[in-house]
């Protein structure tokens, strides 16, 4: 069976579980379960600490896992990114107290930086020729400055609310942009059929989240103009109607552009425009 690691907690956990459920995989029913076998789909799910997933995958103990790109980079393991998953987006930033004179990357020289991602931060500073002390903390790094442990912090920033509440402000360019991703062991062949099935299923979920199915009627004389507005994934499906002057069109369109596309179609003569959500897909 394909061994898959998923986060047991944290901001990536629930979206990861939901994605796997939408892809047809069985999840745990008891929060104390650490391992779930799904023989019908040929997988075994392991619920692990987010920080540890890349380590297990990199060492080959787990075949694939869902983690953050920042966690993968910080792990320094041999695990390989296989595909981005479109959730858990964040930036990794430096932050200093509002009243601090630290405002540029160069100002970090000789300072103390508290972070959970010590390897990522150390490598970034070395790359930019900055010498600083990196202090590893397992969480709540915002408190380190107030407690006198560090001069500044480096941490994942989603909305910035936590930093502002702690009297901190971000500065300098982001160390990196991150999102959730599927990673694989270097021991697992990229062409492995089990990995291919998982990849198709997850990509199908992503497509269903990003696209909708649009149906509309259009005069035959306006079909070319309508197809120019909604070209579809490959090509729209065009069918004749009882009224021989009209055709029915079915096409996939980006969910984010639905209302604008409906307006544009109406302008070129389309009527009976209907949008249907997708539950799953294989492209």
From Swiss-Prot:
GO terms for molecular function: ATP binding; ATP phosphoribosyltransferase activity; magnesium ion binding. Feedback inhibited by histidine. Its cofactor is Mg(2+). Keywords: Amino-acid biosynthesis, ATP-binding, Cytoplasm, Glycosyltransferase, Histidine biosynthesis, Magnesium, Metal-binding, Nucleotide-binding, Transferase. GO terms for cellular component: cytoplasm. It is found in: Cytoplasm. Transmembrane segments: none annotated. Its EC number is 2.4.2.17. Pathway: Amino-acid biosynthesis; L-histidine biosynthesis; L-histidine from 5-phospho-alpha-D-ribose 1-diphosphate: step 1/9. The keyword Oxidoreductase does not apply. SUPFAM superfamilies: GlnB-like, Periplasmic binding protein-like II. It catalyses: 1-(5-phospho-beta-D-ribosyl)-ATP + diphosphate = 5-phospho-alpha-D-ribose 1-diphosphate + ATP. Pfam families: HisG, HisG_C. GO terms for biological process: L-histidine biosynthetic process. Catalyzes the condensation of ATP and 5-phosphoribose 1-diphosphate to form N'-(5'-phosphoribosyl)-ATP (PR-ATP). Has a crucial role in the pathway because the rate of histidine biosynthesis seems to be controlled primarily by regulation of HisG enzymatic activity. PANTHER family: ATP PHOSPHORIBOSYLTRANSFERASE, ATP PHOSPHORIBOSYLTRANSFERASE ATP-PRTASE. Belongs to the ATP phosphoribosyltransferase family. Long subfamily. This is ATP phosphoribosyltransferase. It comes from Bifidobacterium longum (strain NCC 2705).
């Amino acid at each position: 069976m394909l061994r898959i690691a998923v986060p047991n907690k944290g901001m990536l956990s629930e979206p990861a579980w939901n994605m796997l459920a939408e892809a047809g995989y069985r999840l745990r029913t008891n929060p104390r379960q650490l391992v779930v076998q799904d023989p019908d789909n040929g997988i075994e799910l392991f619920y692990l600490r987010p920080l540890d997933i890349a380590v297990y995958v990199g060492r080959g103990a787990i075949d694939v896992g869902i983690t953050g790109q920042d966690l993968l980079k910080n792990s320094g393991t041999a695990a390989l990114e296989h595909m981005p998953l479109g959730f858990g987006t964040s930036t990794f930033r430096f932050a200093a107290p509002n009243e601090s004179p630290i405002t540029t990357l160069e100002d970090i020289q000789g300072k103390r930086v508290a972070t959970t991602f010590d390897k990522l931060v150390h490598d970034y500073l070395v790359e930019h020729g900055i010498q600083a002390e990196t202090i590893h903390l397992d969480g709540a790094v915002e408190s380190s400055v107030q407690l006198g442990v560090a001069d500044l912090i480096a941490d994942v920033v989603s909305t910035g609310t936590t930093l502002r509440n702690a009297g901190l402000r971000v500065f300098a360019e982001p160390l990196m942009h991150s999102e959730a991703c599927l990673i694989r062991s270097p021991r697992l062949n990229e062409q492995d059929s089990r990995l291919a099935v998982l990849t198709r299923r997850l990509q199908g979920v992503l497509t269903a989240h990003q696209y909708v199915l649009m149906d509309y009627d259009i005069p035959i004389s306006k079909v070319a103009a309508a197809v120019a507005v909604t070209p579809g994934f490959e090509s729209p499906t065009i069918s004749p109607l009882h009224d021989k002057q009209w055709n029915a069109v079915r096409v996939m369109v980006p969910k984010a552009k639905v209302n604008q596309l409906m307006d544009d179609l109406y302008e070129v003569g389309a009527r009976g425009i209907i949008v249907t959500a997708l539950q799953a897909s294989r492209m």
